[in-house]
Amino acid sequence: MIITEIIGNIHEQPELRTHHAETITLVDDALTKRIQRLVSDHGSELGLRLPSGHPPLRDGDVLHSDGENSILIAVAPTDVLMIRPGTLRDMAFVAHSLGNRHLPAQFDGDVMIVRYDNTVVDFLEHYGVRYERRSTVMPTPFRHSEHTH
C-alpha cells in the first residue's frame, strides 16, 4: 500500500479512532522524510510518498483507515537536554555558544531544548548552567536551519 496523504490526527479528530489500530513508531529524524518504507507493529508494510513541501509527520497521524482498522504514527521519545539558564545573559551566552555548533534547538517558555550530547553536558557543567536530561516526545522534530558564512 502506498500512502500519499495523511487522513487526519487522532489527537485533533477523536472520531478517527477505530477499534483496532496498528502503530508505526518513528524516531525524530524520520518525521521529516516524505518518502520512506514503513512497517507497523503488526508487520504491515507501507510505502510513504507524500507531496513535496508536506509538513513533518506528527504523533497520532492517521495513514490509513477503513472505519474499523487504522494505521497510526507514534513518535518515539527523544533523549534531550532541557536547559534552564538563570539569567537572560546566561541564556544569550548558551544560545550563542550552542548556535555556533549549529545544534538544532527548540524553545518552550524559558527552556531551551536540544538533543542530548555529552559535549553539551560538559559545556553546561563547566559554566554552571542548569539543565535536566529527559526522554520526551517532542511536538515537532529537530531541524537544521539553512545558513551560509
From Swiss-Prot:
One of its GO terms (cellular component) is cytoplasm. SMART domains: UreE_N. CDD domains: UreE. Gene3D superfamilies: Urease metallochaperone UreE, N-terminal domain, UreE, C-terminal domain. InterPro entries: UreE, UreE_C_dom, UreE_N, UreE_N_sf. It is found in: Cytoplasm. It comes from the Bacteria. GO terms for biological process: protein folding; protein-containing complex assembly; urea metabolic process. Transmembrane segments: none annotated. Keywords: Chaperone, Cytoplasm, Nickel, Nickel insertion. One of its GO terms (molecular function) is unfolded protein binding. Belongs to the UreE family. Involved in urease metallocenter assembly. Binds nickel. Probably functions as a nickel donor during metallocenter assembly. HAMAP family: UreE. This is Urease accessory protein UreE. It comes from Corynebacterium efficiens (strain DSM 44549 / YS-314 / AJ 12310 / JCM 11189 / NBRC 100395).
